[in-house]
Amino acid sequence: MKRLLRGALGLIALLGATGGATRLWLGAEVPPLGGREPVAGLRDSVVVLWDSLGVPHIAARDEEDLFTAIGYLHARDRMWEMDLLRHAALGRLSELFGARTVGADRALRTLELGRIAAAQLEIAGPEGHRLLEAYAHGVNAWIAQGRYRAVEFRIIRHAAEPWRPEHSLAIGRLEAWDLRTTGDELELGDVAARLGPARAAQLAPTYPDTAPTIVPPGEWRSGRGVGAEHDAPLSSAPTLAVRTVFRRAYASAWGPYEREFAGFAPASNAWVLGPSRTASHKPILANDPHLTLRAPSIWYLVGAHAPGYEVVGATIPGIPIVVLGHNARLGWGFTNAMVDDVDYVAEQLSPDSTRYRTPDGWARTEVVAETILVHGSTPLVYRRLRTADGPVIERAGHEAGPPLAMRWVAHDPTDEIGALRAMGRATDLPSFEAALAGFRSPEQNVVYGDAAGNIAYFLAGHVPVRHGGAGFGAASGWAKAGRWDGYLTAAELPRMVNPAQAYVVTANNRVIGDEYPFYISREWELPYRAQRILELVRQDSAATTTSVARAQLDIVDVFCRAIAPLAARAAAATGRPDLAAGLRAWDGAMSPERAEPTLVWSWYRELQRLVYDSVSPGYRPAEPLHHWLARGRSPWNDLSALERRAMATVLPRAAERPWGSVHATVQEHPLSAVPLLGRLLRFNVGPLVTPGGNYTVNVASTDEFAAPFASTWGPSMRHVVDFGDVDGAGGFILPTGQSGYPLSPHYRDETTRWLKGQLWILPLDLQRVRSVSRLVLVPDGRGGR
């Protein structure tokens, strides 16, 4: 997308202004925080107290006015972001950016997020409809006022169209897609075809037997004994489709969407401590979702106050409800549950593609007509196919092989907005658990704490039940094996209330061990963050919000600490005993000023390349390599020799370079690459020298194999709450700021606090809000809704 926007330079020429005048002209587009503003759709006045970080604390007389106000404020601060997400969710990016995003739009249309959103709206019920309509009224009131149009709209010469309730739902499903766990089944199916199932099994993800699970052994007490957690045999069918159809289609179509617009990554930390482990003798809950770091931030903080719904926390612009936060009695946090929620099904079509083969015979293929409007060009009209298994992924070019349909749990309509609203309204553990039962996608690990002293864990979401287990590769649409037989019930999902250990820790690690009778997934995040959090929790017997916030900043990498002796051995063997001594003494802290992180991580990445490139080029799973490093041998090659070779390769570039010189975070704005304009407006936030790494609690991860190791995702928000003092300790913080206007003082004013782990309290008692400005939203005189 960055290349698409270089043409925006013409706008600068049209301004006929100097750089300073340009900044002044654009800066005038930032709306003031105070005053009175009429809002169509309101029935009564709504008071907004702005604190010094630009967080709105909203007081309304009923929920509908509250959500109208949230919609208005979201649009006021983040309308460009909302509009971009809406176009991405609906596969309409080409309306903004022209022909170069047609491939991405075709892929996004295949996800059918608009169809799902329409189905969700049908099941939302009267209250859900009112909530979503109220939010849309607020957004549209801001669009209609016509002032303070974000500079991004000027650059691409576009105006936001009216907001509809289904747009919010489509954005919600876009987030679910970003959090999916597609896993490595397609790559492994291809490996099985080339090298055989036995060899592919050696590359399959494994979770260490001794690594921590979220639900410890002995805590699962279900009386049910059906199903199987065991993997199905590796399948080799139909790998031609996997390799040539899906992979290349993904790279050419979904790939651009993923790089430019996706905001989410499957990782986070959340933990809750019981009363016996805290200084206040009340639970303390902590959460930091690890998502793509971008500008503006994914999240928007609010204090939401109306009778029956008083919640503080993080919202997503475009979605009307608090997603993560707490009320006066209870709170919750999320991490991705890593559920295996997407399967691919190879379909056998008739010669004219009008029918497809099923286990019960031939069925008629559904044909979906699509029209993509293209800025500066003629519309693209085409047809795509759908089967009972899901939408059929389009082939790339003239590649051979059977077509693949995609089965995804989020294709079934569910009411997450209603569930989140009910969670915010809950007053105790039973009412919260009842509300959570409606939350189905994306699947989440949910940690819970309340003022009554309870702590709990729940796996929330749809977990498919597969006929015959879960294999690798694509299932065959004409066979029963691998097909879905519904979902686990709420009673069958893992849960844990007031565990004996008096804490719950989740870091995308395995949910539960072999005692659990149902299949959830085979792919979990490696256990290092969970192990380190457990170390810190067990060392802190009288925790406070200060000590918990400090734990969120921890930069000890358990994995790098474990492999440092191996790196030291390799360094000594290559003639650098001085480096070997330093590595043996290193504690695993990924500090910007230390050189050991640079050397160890560079060595590990080079070793990963050497180990895999001879057998599975382009597919380098971490889990098997970590297992082989722990055992000291690989089934594929001479691991010791490769360790020495990797060290010899990286020493010249990595031996004495501080981690901070190669590891930085830039929170990028989509328009930052536009020459001159990006620099004038300082769209990006960064580069920031950031401690931590891929496996630290304070994550600063990169998915690049080559140095320098730029960090691309990390803590997108931090939240800590002590239920002994919800308004006096803990708080929230974002990595950028509240505003989407680059020249606003609130565009990047939280960054320093985020780096230092300094949280910002959002009081539930409005009398304790330290407001710096007051905005009153009033009905516009047209009678409200």
Enumerate the language-model features and the residues they cover.
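Glycine- and hydrophobic-rich flexible loops that cap the catalytic core of alpha/beta enzyme folds
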Residues: Y250, G263-A265, A306-I321, G325-L330, ...
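N-terminal Sec-pathway targeting helices
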Residues: M1-L15
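Substrate-recognition/specificity elements adjacent to catalytic centers across diverse enzyme folds
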Residues: G20-I284, P289-A295, G313
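A terminal-accessory region detector
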Residues: R164, R576-V666
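Terminal end segments
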Residues: Y519, E523-R576, R657-R785
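Proteins synthesized as precursors that undergo proteolytic processing into mature forms
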Residues: G103, G114-R115, A136-H137, P413-Q444, ...
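Hydrophobic alpha-helical segments
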Residues: S441-D540, L607-Q608
